[in-house]
Amino acid sequence: MLGDYFIDKCTSTAIENAPWAHQYFADTLPEDSFKKLRECCENIKIKNAEPKFYTDVSGTYISCPILIYPKDFKDYNIDFEDEIYSIAKAILENARVLCGQYPRYRWFQNLGVNAHISITPPLPYKFYIHQEGLEKIWSSVTYITPEKNIGTKMYKAQNEKAFIKEAIWKPNSTFIFCGEQNKTWHSYESNQATNRITLNLFLMKHSKQRNFYQRHLYQ
């Protein structure tokens, strides 16, 4: 099962502690599964030619990423819903194990997995330095395409001078962490002329307003 493969990668990877607890590993998915996902993503036709905009903390207008949820995969000819289901189910079933690797983590009784493909604009796109939303417990980002780009940057504080390291962009590599308030500062951006596409999986408090795989589905 693909879900078991993903969990094995997560639980067999050591925690790195600088600048805060996180994991980073390659070969997240088996070669054939990743090839299938990448080909689907490279052929995505974006329906909304004009991206939405929002204002970041500095007051600068930046493009809003387009998020494609499993329920909408068929609209974009993405044939990967069964695989995402397997991974999300495994994350829920192993929630305590995944989080228990970390020194500190949040917890909620009503859990869900928010799974989606994120399409962020080409350069000069940049998502400002931020911390994870308080509703998120465990965050995983798998790099899909293009071949070269900028990964996730980590900081000790919410300013550029506090930059410590980058989870390097490499297709089929994954960056994971458990959000801690006022600590897990990070940002991401694009330095290429093509969309930056990732697979995002968030273990978090369930919300009816969001797209979730819910714990009760598997009980």
Which residue ranges define each predicted feature?
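Non-heme Fe(II)/2-oxoglutarate
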Residues: 2-5, 10-99
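Short His-Asn-centered micro-motif
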Residues: 26-27, 131, 178-179
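Active-site rim elements
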Residues: 67-86, 125-129, 162-164, 185-189
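A short coil-to-beta-strand element that immediately follows conserved catalytic motifs
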Residues: 97-116
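Acidic carboxylate-rich catalytic motifs and surrounding loops in phosphoryl-/glycosyl-chemistry enzymes
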Residues: 112-119, 184-190
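Conserved short histidine dyad/triad with adjacent acidic residue
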Residues: 117-133
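Catalytic core of Fe(II)/2-oxoglutarate
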Residues: 125, 134-136, 144-219
